[in-house]
């Protein structure tokens, strides 16, 4: 017999922890650049009965019966994704961005082939060739980095390395890079050396959808992304590609990497894509960028140095070396003050990855709450006060009180706290 108790009765420990996490999100300033807050509609889809359905295969071609409804759900997600990004084909089944990237690699290259990708030490991602990740273990990785003069991607170096190593794949994308990615220039280099270009736009997908960052779709063989971050959907992945790669990519996801898709998550993706197709989503993305620029200027006014001097997108990297702080110390101090960031390697970082010399800061989540330029100026000042006295518990307590007061003016998930 099916248990009929609600969560609070069936498992009070988990129910209590969920309430605590919801309260933490509601009462603190979320500045992790890869995090965002989904809408109640997305949450509703995630918690739906679609979680019960197994649906190996693709719409119209399933290995299980009873898929007539989830076929419609998944097709809606596919159609909305294609419309949102102007793509020939979309696969919405990847459980995460890592699986999307794995499928892209396997569709275009063989183990041992050369991949030219941005170094994790300069803002890339684990799946772009880190030796501890499958990508670094299966492929020969040639990393590219930044110019020391302005801390932006050294396109001359990318071209030189491409000509020297003739990679099978040129991977473009980053997890901690605050400047515009010029996909047309990367495509020129890829075409010159006969490489297939793959773009991981996980961080900037929302900006791309809103036309606030150049789109990689016209220039790339394959584009991968997560569906959260700036896109403000559920945690998950997606692949966009040219029609010529559709069959191969689909087979790499299923049966190559994954089994049954998570149809409740796919439904939530469809809801988020529908939200992103509305005019107000473009206005939201504009506010993300505007808020990031105001926050960046405020942090500089507080005496902090930003990598590359600022931002073109939703995030910025703060170099803490002039403050004689590590990212670990800054993350912990800000956390005690109710401000959540993540420690992050900066270019040419002398510290270890679990210590770092920087923090990464982003504006998507605070923008979702409705905060604007005025609040960004205040947030920058609060961060500055904490980093000026990271060991002073009185300062941290005062800032935490101000953070809680600020958040109270921008309530979130009020019915769930």
From Swiss-Prot:
It catalyses: (6R)-5,10-methylene-5,6,7,8-tetrahydrofolate + glycine + H2O = (6S)-5,6,7,8-tetrahydrofolate + L-serine. Its main location: cytoplasm. One of its GO terms (cellular component) is cytosol. Keywords: Amino-acid biosynthesis, Cytoplasm, One-carbon metabolism, Pyridoxal phosphate, Transferase. Its cofactor is pyridoxal 5'-phosphate. (6S)-5,6,7,8-tetrahydrofolate binds at residues 120, 124-126. The modification N6-(pyridoxal phosphate)lysine is found at residue 229. It comes from the Bacteria. One of its GO terms (molecular function) is glycine hydroxymethyltransferase activity. PROSITE patterns: SHMT. GO terms for biological process: glycine biosynthetic process from serine; tetrahydrofolate interconversion. Pathway: One-carbon metabolism; tetrahydrofolate interconversion; Amino-acid biosynthesis; glycine biosynthesis; glycine from L-serine: step 1/1. It is found in: Cytoplasm. Its EC number is 2.1.2.1. CDD domains: SHMT. InterPro entries: PyrdxlP-dep_Trfase (IPR015424), PyrdxlP-dep_Trfase_major (IPR015421), PyrdxlP-dep_Trfase_small (IPR015422), Ser_HO-MeTrfase (IPR001085), Ser_HO-MeTrfase-like (IPR049943), Ser_HO-MeTrfase_PLP_BS (IPR019798), SHMT-like_dom (IPR039429). Signal peptide: none annotated. The record marks 228 as: Plays an important role in substrate specificity. Homodimer. NCBIfam families: PRK00011.1. Catalyzes the reversible interconversion of serine and glycine with tetrahydrofolate (THF) serving as the one-carbon carrier. This reaction serves as the major source of one-carbon groups required for the biosynthesis of purines, thymidylate, methionine, and other important biomolecules. Also exhibits THF-independent aldolase activity toward beta-hydroxyamino acids, producing glycine and aldehydes, via a retro-aldol mechanism. Belongs to the SHMT family. This is Serine hydroxymethyltransferase. The lineage of its organism: Bacteria, Pseudomonadati, Myxococcota, Myxococcia, Myxococcales.
């Amino acid at each position: 017999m099916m248990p009929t108790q609600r969560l609070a009765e069936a498992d009070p420990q988990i129910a209590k922890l969920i309430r605590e996490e919801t309260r933490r999100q509601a009462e603190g300033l979320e500045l992790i650049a890869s995090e965002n807050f989904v809408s109640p509609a997305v949450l509703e889809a995630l918690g739906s009965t679609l979680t019960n359905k197994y649906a190996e295969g693709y719409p119209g071609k399933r290995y299980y019966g009873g898929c007539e409804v989830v076929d419609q759900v998944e097709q809606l997600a596919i159609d909305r994704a294609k419309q949102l990004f102007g793509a020939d084909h979309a696969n919405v089944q990847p459980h995460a961005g890592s699986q999307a990237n794995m499928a892209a690699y396997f569709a275009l290259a063989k183990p041992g082939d050369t991949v030219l990708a941005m170094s994790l030490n300069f803002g890339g991602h684990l799946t772009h060739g880190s030796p501890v990740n499958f990508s670094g273990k299966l492929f020969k990785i040639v990393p590219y980095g930044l110019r020391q003069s302005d801390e932006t991607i050294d396109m001359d170096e990318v071209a030189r390395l491409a000509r020297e190593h003739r990679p099978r794949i040129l991977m473009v994308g980053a997890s901690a890079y605050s400047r515009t990615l010029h996909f047309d220039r990367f495509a020129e280099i890829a075409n010159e050396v006969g490489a297939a270009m793959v773009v991981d736009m996980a961080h900037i997908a929302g900006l791309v959808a809103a036309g606030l960052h150049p789109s990689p779709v016209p220039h790339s063989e394959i584009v991968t992304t997560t569906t959260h971050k700036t896109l403000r959907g559920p945690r998950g992945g997606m692949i966009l590609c040219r029609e010529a790669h559709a069959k191969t990519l689909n087979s790499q996801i299923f049966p190559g990497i994954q089994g049954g898709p998570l149809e409740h998550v796919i439904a939530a993706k469809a809801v988020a894509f529908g939200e992103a197709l509305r005019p107000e989503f473009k206005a939201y993305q504009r506010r993300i960028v505007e808020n990031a620029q105001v926050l960046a200027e405020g942090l500089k006014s507080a005496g902090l140095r930003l990598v590359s001097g600022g931002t073109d997108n939703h995030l910025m990297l703060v170099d803490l070396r002039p403050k004689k702080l590590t990212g670990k110390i800054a993350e912990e101090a800000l956390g005690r003050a109710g401000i959540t960031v993540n420690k992050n390697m900066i270019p040419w970082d002398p510290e270890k990855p679990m210590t770092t010399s920087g923090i990464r800061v982003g504006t998507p989540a605070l923008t979702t709450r409705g905060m604007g330029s005025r609040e960004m100026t205040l947030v920058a000042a609060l961060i500055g006060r904490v980093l000026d006295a990271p060991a002073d518990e009185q300062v941290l307590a005062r800032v935490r009180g101000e953070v809680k007061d600020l958040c109270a003016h921008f309530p979130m998930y009020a019915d769930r706290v």
